[in-house]
Amino acid sequence: MVDSHGSDTECSSKKKKEKTKEKGVYRGARMRSWGKWVSEIREPRKKSRIWLGTFPTAEMAARAHDVAALSIKGSSAILNFPELADFLPRPVSLSQQDIQAAAAEAALMDFKTVPFHLQDDSTPLQTRCDTEKIEKWSSSSSSASSSSSSSSSSSSSMLSGELGDIVELPSLENNVKYDCALYDSLEGLVSMPPWLDATENDFRYGDDSVLLDPCLKESFLWNYE
Protein backbone atom coordinates (compact mmCIF):
# COMPACT_ATOMS: atom_id res chain seq x y z
CA MET A 1 0.00 0.00 0.00
CA VAL A 2 2.78 2.38 0.91
CA ASP A 3 4.63 1.71 -2.30
CA SER A 4 1.56 2.29 -4.41
CA HIS A 5 0.87 5.58 -2.65
CA GLY A 6 4.43 6.75 -3.19
CA SER A 7 4.28 5.90 -6.87
CA ASP A 8 1.03 7.85 -7.23
CA THR A 9 2.64 10.90 -5.64
CA GLU A 10 5.60 10.76 -8.02
CA CYS A 11 3.31 10.43 -11.02
CA SER A 12 1.23 13.42 -9.97
CA SER A 13 4.33 15.59 -9.46
CA LYS A 14 5.63 14.64 -12.89
CA LYS A 15 2.29 15.50 -14.43
CA LYS A 16 2.34 18.90 -12.73
CA LYS A 17 5.82 19.63 -14.07
CA GLU A 18 4.84 18.58 -17.59
CA LYS A 19 1.67 20.66 -17.37
CA THR A 20 3.69 23.62 -16.18
CA LYS A 21 6.10 23.29 -19.13
CA GLU A 22 3.23 23.03 -21.58
CA LYS A 23 1.71 26.24 -20.28
CA GLY A 24 5.07 27.98 -20.53
CA VAL A 25 5.05 29.34 -16.98
CA TYR A 26 7.66 32.01 -16.32
CA ARG A 27 8.96 33.55 -13.14
CA GLY A 28 6.53 36.16 -11.83
CA ALA A 29 3.76 35.14 -14.27
CA ARG A 30 0.58 33.26 -13.36
CA MET A 31 -2.30 32.10 -15.51
CA ARG A 32 -5.83 32.94 -14.45
CA SER A 33 -8.80 30.62 -14.87
CA TRP A 34 -10.18 32.73 -17.73
CA GLY A 35 -6.99 32.36 -19.76
CA LYS A 36 -5.19 35.65 -19.08
CA TRP A 37 -1.74 36.01 -17.58
CA VAL A 38 -0.96 38.21 -14.60
CA SER A 39 2.44 39.44 -13.47
CA GLU A 40 3.60 40.65 -10.06
CA ILE A 41 6.80 40.92 -8.07
CA ARG A 42 7.59 41.02 -4.38
CA GLU A 43 9.08 44.24 -3.08
CA PRO A 44 12.50 43.89 -1.44
CA ARG A 45 12.44 43.31 2.33
CA LYS A 46 8.64 43.46 2.30
CA LYS A 47 5.76 41.01 2.18
CA SER A 48 3.77 43.17 -0.23
CA ARG A 49 3.83 42.71 -4.00
CA ILE A 50 3.78 45.14 -6.89
CA TRP A 51 1.00 44.39 -9.35
CA LEU A 52 2.34 44.69 -12.90
CA GLY A 53 -0.80 43.96 -14.91
CA THR A 54 -2.84 41.39 -16.82
CA PHE A 55 -1.59 40.28 -20.23
CA PRO A 56 -2.87 37.99 -23.03
CA THR A 57 0.33 35.90 -23.28
CA ALA A 58 2.81 34.43 -20.84
CA GLU A 59 5.75 36.06 -22.63
CA MET A 60 4.30 39.53 -22.13
CA ALA A 61 3.83 38.88 -18.42
CA ALA A 62 7.36 37.49 -18.20
CA ARG A 63 8.89 40.59 -19.82
CA ALA A 64 6.94 42.81 -17.44
CA HIS A 65 8.39 40.85 -14.53
CA ASP A 66 11.93 41.15 -15.91
CA VAL A 67 11.68 44.94 -16.09
CA ALA A 68 10.49 45.13 -12.49
CA ALA A 69 13.18 42.69 -11.34
CA LEU A 70 15.94 44.68 -13.04
CA SER A 71 14.65 47.89 -11.50
CA ILE A 72 14.44 46.52 -7.98
CA LYS A 73 17.28 43.99 -7.79
CA GLY A 74 19.63 45.22 -10.49
CA SER A 75 22.22 42.83 -11.92
CA SER A 76 21.42 40.20 -9.28
CA ALA A 77 17.87 39.74 -10.63
CA ILE A 78 16.87 36.35 -12.03
CA LEU A 79 15.28 36.99 -15.42
CA ASN A 80 13.06 35.02 -17.72
CA PHE A 81 14.82 36.46 -20.78
CA PRO A 82 18.37 37.40 -19.78
CA GLU A 83 19.28 37.97 -23.45
CA LEU A 84 16.80 40.89 -23.53
CA ALA A 85 18.17 42.65 -20.45
CA ASP A 86 19.92 45.40 -22.43
CA PHE A 87 16.86 46.10 -24.59
CA LEU A 88 14.15 46.36 -21.97
CA PRO A 89 12.99 49.82 -20.86
CA ARG A 90 13.83 51.21 -17.45
CA PRO A 91 11.46 53.12 -15.15
CA VAL A 92 12.04 56.80 -14.49
CA SER A 93 12.08 56.14 -10.74
CA LEU A 94 11.54 53.23 -8.35
CA SER A 95 8.00 54.28 -7.55
CA GLN A 96 5.27 51.71 -8.07
CA GLN A 97 3.62 53.74 -10.85
CA ASP A 98 6.86 54.14 -12.84
CA ILE A 99 7.70 50.44 -12.51
CA GLN A 100 4.22 49.51 -13.73
CA ALA A 101 4.54 51.87 -16.71
CA ALA A 102 7.93 50.41 -17.72
CA ALA A 103 6.58 46.87 -17.31
CA ALA A 104 3.61 47.62 -19.56
CA GLU A 105 5.95 49.10 -22.19
CA ALA A 106 8.15 46.01 -22.13
CA ALA A 107 5.13 43.74 -22.47
CA LEU A 108 4.04 45.53 -25.65
CA MET A 109 7.46 45.27 -27.31
CA ASP A 110 7.69 42.79 -30.20
CA PHE A 111 10.85 40.70 -30.28
CA LYS A 112 9.58 37.99 -32.64
CA THR A 113 10.03 39.83 -35.94
CA VAL A 114 13.80 39.32 -36.18
CA PRO A 115 15.71 36.68 -34.19
CA PHE A 116 18.16 38.26 -31.81
CA HIS A 117 21.06 36.08 -32.90
CA LEU A 118 20.70 37.53 -36.44
CA GLN A 119 20.77 41.16 -35.35
CA ASP A 120 24.02 43.02 -35.90
CA ASP A 121 25.71 44.98 -33.12
CA SER A 122 23.09 43.74 -30.63
CA THR A 123 20.67 46.46 -31.74
CA PRO A 124 17.02 45.97 -30.71
CA LEU A 125 14.38 45.85 -33.41
CA GLN A 126 12.51 48.94 -32.25
CA THR A 127 15.71 50.99 -32.10
CA ARG A 128 16.77 49.90 -35.59
CA CYS A 129 13.36 50.75 -37.01
CA ASP A 130 13.48 54.21 -35.45
CA THR A 131 17.01 54.72 -36.80
CA GLU A 132 15.90 53.77 -40.32
CA LYS A 133 12.98 56.21 -40.12
CA ILE A 134 15.32 59.02 -38.98
CA GLU A 135 17.78 58.26 -41.80
CA LYS A 136 15.00 58.30 -44.41
CA TRP A 137 13.66 61.58 -43.05
CA SER A 138 17.10 63.22 -42.97
CA SER A 139 17.89 62.10 -46.55
CA SER A 140 14.55 63.40 -47.85
CA SER A 141 14.97 66.70 -46.00
CA SER A 142 18.55 67.13 -47.32
CA SER A 143 17.41 66.45 -50.90
CA ALA A 144 14.57 68.91 -50.49
CA SER A 145 16.92 71.57 -49.13
CA SER A 146 19.41 71.01 -52.00
CA SER A 147 16.64 71.26 -54.60
CA SER A 148 15.31 74.44 -53.00
CA SER A 149 18.81 75.97 -52.91
CA SER A 150 19.41 75.10 -56.58
CA SER A 151 16.03 76.53 -57.58
CA SER A 152 16.72 79.71 -55.61
CA SER A 153 20.15 80.10 -57.24
CA SER A 154 18.69 79.56 -60.72
CA SER A 155 15.89 82.04 -60.04
CA SER A 156 18.39 84.60 -58.76
CA SER A 157 20.54 84.17 -61.91
CA MET A 158 17.46 84.55 -64.12
CA LEU A 159 16.46 87.67 -62.21
CA SER A 160 19.92 89.19 -62.58
CA GLY A 161 19.85 88.42 -66.33
CA GLU A 162 16.46 90.08 -66.73
CA LEU A 163 17.62 93.12 -64.82
CA GLY A 164 20.69 93.27 -67.03
CA ASP A 165 18.48 93.28 -70.12
CA ILE A 166 16.16 95.96 -68.74
CA VAL A 167 18.71 98.25 -67.11
CA GLU A 168 21.24 98.73 -69.91
CA LEU A 169 22.99 102.04 -69.53
CA PRO A 170 24.23 103.75 -72.70
CA SER A 171 27.93 104.04 -73.27
CA LEU A 172 29.13 107.55 -72.60
CA GLU A 173 32.13 107.14 -74.88
CA ASN A 174 30.11 106.17 -77.97
CA ASN A 175 26.92 108.22 -77.58
CA VAL A 176 28.18 111.57 -76.40
CA LYS A 177 28.63 113.90 -79.35
CA TYR A 178 30.46 117.10 -79.16
CA ASP A 179 28.79 119.85 -81.12
CA CYS A 180 31.69 122.20 -80.60
CA ALA A 181 35.32 121.54 -81.38
CA LEU A 182 37.98 121.95 -78.75
CA TYR A 183 40.85 124.14 -79.61
CA ASP A 184 44.28 124.00 -78.17
CA SER A 185 45.54 127.39 -77.04
CA LEU A 186 49.02 126.56 -78.31
CA GLU A 187 47.86 126.15 -81.91
CA GLY A 188 46.70 129.72 -82.10
CA LEU A 189 43.50 131.57 -81.69
CA VAL A 190 40.65 131.32 -84.11
CA SER A 191 40.49 134.48 -86.20
CA MET A 192 37.52 136.56 -85.31
CA PRO A 193 35.71 138.99 -87.58
CA PRO A 194 36.89 142.59 -87.65
CA TRP A 195 33.89 143.92 -85.86
CA LEU A 196 34.68 141.66 -82.87
CA ASP A 197 38.19 143.06 -82.71
CA ALA A 198 36.80 146.56 -82.92
CA THR A 199 34.55 146.12 -79.91
CA GLU A 200 37.34 146.58 -77.43
CA ASN A 201 35.06 147.53 -74.58
CA ASP A 202 33.03 144.35 -74.86
CA PHE A 203 35.71 141.70 -75.48
CA ARG A 204 39.09 143.13 -74.49
CA TYR A 205 40.20 144.37 -71.12
CA GLY A 206 43.69 145.69 -71.23
CA ASP A 207 46.24 143.25 -72.61
CA ASP A 208 44.26 140.10 -71.78
CA SER A 209 42.03 138.63 -74.44
CA VAL A 210 38.81 136.84 -73.65
CA LEU A 211 38.47 133.57 -75.57
CA LEU A 212 34.94 132.94 -76.72
CA ASP A 213 33.39 129.54 -77.05
CA PRO A 214 33.72 128.22 -80.62
CA CYS A 215 29.98 127.69 -80.83
CA LEU A 216 29.40 131.32 -79.83
CA LYS A 217 31.93 132.48 -82.37
CA GLU A 218 30.25 130.38 -85.06
CA SER A 219 26.92 132.03 -84.28
CA PHE A 220 28.58 135.42 -84.50
CA LEU A 221 30.06 134.51 -87.88
CA TRP A 222 26.67 133.52 -89.24
CA ASN A 223 25.13 136.71 -88.00
CA TYR A 224 27.96 138.72 -89.49
CA GLU A 225 27.49 137.24 -92.96
From Swiss-Prot:
The modification Phosphoserine is found at residue 95. InterPro entries: AP2/ERF_dom, AP2/ERF_dom_sf, AP2/ERF_TF_ERF_subfamily, DNA-bd_dom_sf. Residues 138-157 have a biased composition (Low complexity). Gene3D superfamilies: AP2/ERF domain. It is found in: Nucleus. Residues 1-25 have a biased composition (Basic and acidic residues). GO terms for molecular function: DNA binding; DNA-binding transcription factor activity. Residues 25-82 bind DNA. CDD domains: AP2 (cd00018). Induction: By drought. It comes from the Eukaryota. One of its GO terms (biological process) is ethylene-activated signaling pathway. Keywords: Activator, DNA-binding, Ethylene signaling pathway, Nucleus, Phosphoprotein, Transcription, Transcription regulation. Expressed in roots, stems, seeds and stamen. Probably acts as a transcriptional activator. Binds to the GCC-box pathogenesis-related promoter element. May be involved in the regulation of gene expression by stress factors and by components of stress signal transduction pathways. This is Ethylene-responsive transcription factor ERF042. It comes from Arabidopsis thaliana. The gene is ERF042.
